[in-house]
């Protein structure tokens, strides 16, 4: 049983993997992590899934409970690696808003933006379908309405439950074939290289990635603004304003990431599968650097 945020949920998945395969040191994980093929597509390793089941009770909104993957930091390389198996998904996920009143507000709101990032990049994906769009639009509607309510009244349990349902819908859309993009890819590197909490990585990166991608998916971005209650407005401006309304950081400077680290972040990002699913093609570190400079 795991009770807590997304990192704890993923830790539970990794513990189950260790129990199944007798992993007891860092080198033991190498055979089980996913790798990129020459086309930039993630290829999971083949292995027996864990026989020990997991019950997850999330207290944040990062939505890692609902998928078959787990992210784990490799402290040897400062890279965040992905592990995937259908049996890594928790057998039961319990959404109870009551315990979440004890979650620090910055964690609740920033992981809410993480869920909004899932829905936004999924809705803007070139792989989006009618099924995924249905989930993502409803996720954006719920999250954009409920997160400010919780900020105003931390004990508003109905609003907290709406946030949790929005979180679930924000990841359910991936079952319809949509993929994430550069906000997720760069965010993974910000976490691995600089230790930025992944809720904050979405706060900082998502608006700038939307602006970078506008030439490739302006029509899809209009759906984001519409779902958030701002039809006809620029999606990046809507998302940035929403993050500002919640009192969350919007620049790399605000999360203590300086230009001296940009090259390492960009290099790490080139090994992330989501970069190659970004709507605007990104093939070199300089493409990542362009977004980092905009977010500085």
Predicted regions and their residues:
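Buried hydrophobic positions in well-ordered alpha/beta secondary-structure cores of metabolic enzymes
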Residues: 6, 58, 96, 116, ...
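Gly/Ser/Thr-rich loops at beta-strand to alpha-helix junctions
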Residues: 5-9, 61-63
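Short Gly/Thr/Asp-enriched flexible loops that form oxyanion-binding sites at enzyme active sites
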Residues: 8-22, 67-68
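Periplasmic-binding protein-like
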Residues: 1-3
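C-terminal charged capping/lid subdomain of soluble metabolic enzymes
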Residues: 225, 229-296
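Active-site segments that bind and position negatively charged phosphate/pyrophosphate groups
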Residues: 122-238
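A glycine/threonine-rich phosphate-anchoring loop and its flanking beta-alpha core
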Residues: 21-130
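Short alpha-helical scaffolding segments that buttress acidic/His motifs in well-ordered protein cores
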Residues: 116-120, 163-171, 206, 239, ...
